């Protein structure tokens, strides 16, 4: 990487700009545009770095208003040379995700659309619907994000009827399978009545459904049925026949888009209001719509920006799928800025030609029009939800007599059972929407709170101190401070928080209220009576959603702590087994029962557990006189 820095914009220094451009090689790679403060403004990729970077500073080159504004601020150019264009594409995506440059088109991290996850990292993988991708398990596979969550759940339920799959995260019984095994919904994973290899073969067939390869799966099952019949395994053949028939019902529910078509294709379109863009990606395989994916991104105002958004979506999507899921054709509403590079990369990944098509024929144009209509419907739905949130924030600002809308609202709640395992939650709403990346848990450490005696007031005071003390001491900036704090409770809980905020000289920095559960009453500091509101007001409903989310988050964490403590209580009695090794044991075996049943050899498979400690653990659960 080469860094070139100027105290002013490079546009103001043509000779210096030309020297900088000459330093950049004509090789594939990634380039960075930075301002005079060293902040990264834009990250891009190119087959020929110098040619691409030079194009930004040519008057004849058409630019969007956003890029034109960015170019005026560029005082620094950096680059990383890669061996191939494909490496440049992958590196660019990772760097944009890491740095979030202001002038790049950024996809919104939306939790609204669900994924299907298959946990290939586990010995017996599970399949389930989730709205959050786990980044720490590289082997796990995600399909989506799907727009229609109802249809997705119906599909998964039907699949679980067709193929016997693992249903539970933890076994229900110790020495026998549960009812799911008896009714044929599970192959008895908990008792290892099926080998991991055979189970994974079944799950590979399920994965083919979400890869859009149902026709290929139908052919595979037909071959297996015929082979079973030829081998006189008639019961197995009948079971596969039933699977084929059920699979036909699954396909029957899918919309026919291009009859008699055998080509795999994706069609993508975008609708934007200038503030946000809704993108729809339709996956069509053998003439049937097998997947409808949705994304959100920054707003666009021109065809050039539309192409940038679509390019970013396609790059992110195809980098996360397997080669068999890449279609032979992608239907586009407009040209992509780096379409040739993306096309070459997709072709190399797939192993066969991938075509980008701006449709001229009526059938494909009608298909693209259908995708565009769905993108527009999704944008309108999002606009209505945004308007609803704005109405709630405006109503809340009026109730609390705030000068501006509360952009960031934090809610706090305490959870415990008679003072034991006391924990607190901090949840955050931004623009009226939950922002889970800012949620926090707190374990209450106050030594004055004894087991068997609860003290919500002291617990809340401790949490508020821990939340803001770093910012007060100057160790953290104050950009993440809330506009409004809501406490779950009544006047007592509010008074405890107000008291500690006064000590920290923070009471005038933001508004603090409490929301009592029984009548949804809002209390302000120093007021003996609640504010005159009614429960159906949009602002009150917003606070109630915040309060309920804080309560849910606190109770969930408290339940985890109780479970963890109950698991560790017996392990604490084993000499030489510290806390970190206890965690490794539980992570490996998943339950205390499995640790108890493990052999010395199996115990030694856990990192950090040597032969002597493994024998000690085994002897603890298997005393000689038992």
UniProtKB/Swiss-Prot annotation:
Biological process per Gene Ontology, one example term: DNA damage response
Subcellular location: Cytoplasm
Gene3D superfamilies per record: 5' to 3' exonuclease, C-terminal subdomain, GIY-YIG endonuclease, UVR domain, UvrC, RNAse H endonuclease domain
InterPro entries reported in the protein's UniProt record: DisA/LigA_HHH, GIY-YIG_endonuc, GIY-YIG_endonuc_sf, GIY-YIG_UvrC_Cho, Hlx-hairpin-Hlx_DNA-bd_motif, RuvA_2-like, UVR_dom, UVR_dom_sf
Protein name per the record: UvrABC system protein C
Regions annotated as coiled coil: none
The keyword DNA repair appears for this protein: yes
Gene Ontology terms: cellular component: cytoplasm; excinuclease repair complex
Family to which the UniProt record says this protein belongs: Belongs to the UvrC family.
Function: The UvrABC repair system catalyzes the recognition and processing of DNA lesions. UvrC both incises the 5' and 3' sides of the lesion. The N-terminal half is responsible for the 3' incision and the C-terminal half is responsible for the 5' incision.
Alphabetized SMART domains for the sequence: GIYc (SM00465), HhH1 (SM00278)
Keyword set, alphabetical order: Cytoplasm, DNA damage, DNA excision, DNA repair, Excision nuclease
Other information: This bacterium is considerably more resistant to UV and gamma irradiation than E.coli; the E.coli-like SOS regulon model is not an appropriate model for DNA repair in this cyanobacterium.
GO MF term list: DNA binding; excinuclease ABC activity
Main subcellular location of this protein, as a coarse class: cytoplasm
Annotated ranges, domain GIY-YIG: 26-105
Complexes and interactors: Interacts with UvrB in an incision complex.
The UVR domain, residue ranges: 215-250
């Amino acid at each position: 990487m080469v860094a070139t820095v100027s105290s002013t914009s490079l546009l103001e220094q043509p000779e210096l700009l030309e020297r900088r451009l000459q330093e950049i090689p004509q090789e594939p790679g990634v380039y960075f545009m930075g301002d005079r403060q060293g902040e990264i403004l834009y990250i891009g990729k190119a087959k020929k770095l110098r040619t691409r970077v030079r194009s930004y500073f040519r008057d004849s080159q058409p630019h969007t208003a956003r890029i034109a504004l960015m170019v005026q601020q560029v005082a620094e150019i950096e680059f990383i040379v890669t061996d191939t264009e494909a490496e440049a594409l992958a590196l660019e995506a990772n760097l944009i995700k890491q740095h979030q440059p202001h002038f790049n088109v950024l996809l919104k991290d939306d939790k609204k659309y669900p994924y299907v996850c298959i946990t290939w990292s586990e010995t017996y993988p599970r399949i389930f619907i989730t709205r959050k991708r786990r980044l720490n398990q590289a082997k796990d596979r995600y399909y989506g994000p799907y727009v229609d969550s109802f249809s997705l759940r119906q599909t998964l339920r039907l699949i679980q009827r067709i193929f016997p799959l693992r249903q539970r995260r933890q076994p229900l019984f110790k020495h026998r399978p549960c009812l799911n095994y008896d009714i044929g919904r599970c192959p008895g994973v908990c008792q290892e009545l099926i080998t991991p290899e055979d189970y994974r073969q079944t799950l590979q067939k399920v994965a083919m459904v979400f890869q859009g390869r149902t026709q290929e799966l139908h052919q595979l099952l037909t071959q297996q049925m015929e082979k079973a019949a030829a081998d006189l395994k008639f019961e197995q053949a009948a079971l596969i026949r039933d699977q084929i028939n059920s699979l036909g019902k699954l396909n029957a529910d899918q919309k026919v888009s291009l009859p008699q078509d055998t080509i795999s294709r994706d069609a993508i379109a975008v609708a934007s209001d200038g503030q946000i863009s809704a993108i729809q990606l339709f996956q069509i395989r053998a003439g049937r719509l097998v997947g409808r994916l949705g994304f959100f991104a920054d707003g666009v105002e021109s065809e050039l920006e539309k192409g940038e958004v679509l390019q970013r979506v396609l790059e992110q999507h195809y980098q996360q799928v397997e080669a068999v899921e890449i279609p032979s054709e992608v239907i586009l509403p407009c040209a992509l800025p780096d379409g040739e590079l993306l096309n070459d990369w997709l072709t190399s990944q797939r192993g066969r030609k991938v075509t980008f098509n701006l449709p001229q024929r009526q059938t494909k144009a009608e298909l693209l029009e259908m995708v565009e209509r769905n993108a527009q419907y999704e944008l309108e739905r999002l606009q209505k939800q945004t308007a609803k949130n704005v109405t709630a924030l405006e109503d809340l600002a009026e109730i609390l007599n705030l000068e501006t809308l509360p952009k960031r609202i934090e809610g706090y709640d305490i959870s415990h059972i008679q003072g034991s395992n006391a924990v607190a939650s901090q949840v955050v709403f931004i623009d009226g929407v939950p922002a889970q990346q800012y949620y926090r848990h707190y374990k209450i450490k106050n030594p004055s709170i004894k087991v068997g005696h609860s003290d919500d007031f002291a617990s809340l005071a401790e949490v508020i101190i821990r939340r803001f003390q770093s910012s007060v001491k100057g160790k953290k900036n104050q950009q993440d401070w809330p506009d409004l704090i809501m406490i779950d409770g009544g006047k007592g809980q509010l008074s405890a928080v107000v008291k500690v905020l006064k000590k920290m000289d923070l009471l005038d920095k933001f508004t603090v209220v409490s929301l009592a559960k029984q009548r949804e009453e809002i209390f302000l500091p120093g007021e003996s009576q609640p504010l005159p509101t009614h429960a159906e007001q949009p602002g009150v409903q917003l606070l109630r959603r915040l309060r309920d989310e804080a309560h849910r988050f606190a109770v969930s964490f408290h339940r985890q702590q109780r479970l963890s403590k109950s698991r560790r209580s017996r392990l604490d009695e084993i000499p030489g087994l510290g806390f970190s090794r206890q965690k490794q044991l539980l992570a490996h075996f998943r339950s205390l029962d499995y640790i108890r049943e493990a052999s010395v050899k199996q115990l030694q498979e856990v990192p950090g557990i040597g032969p002597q400690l493994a024998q000690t653990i085994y002897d603890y659960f298997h005393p000689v006189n038992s």
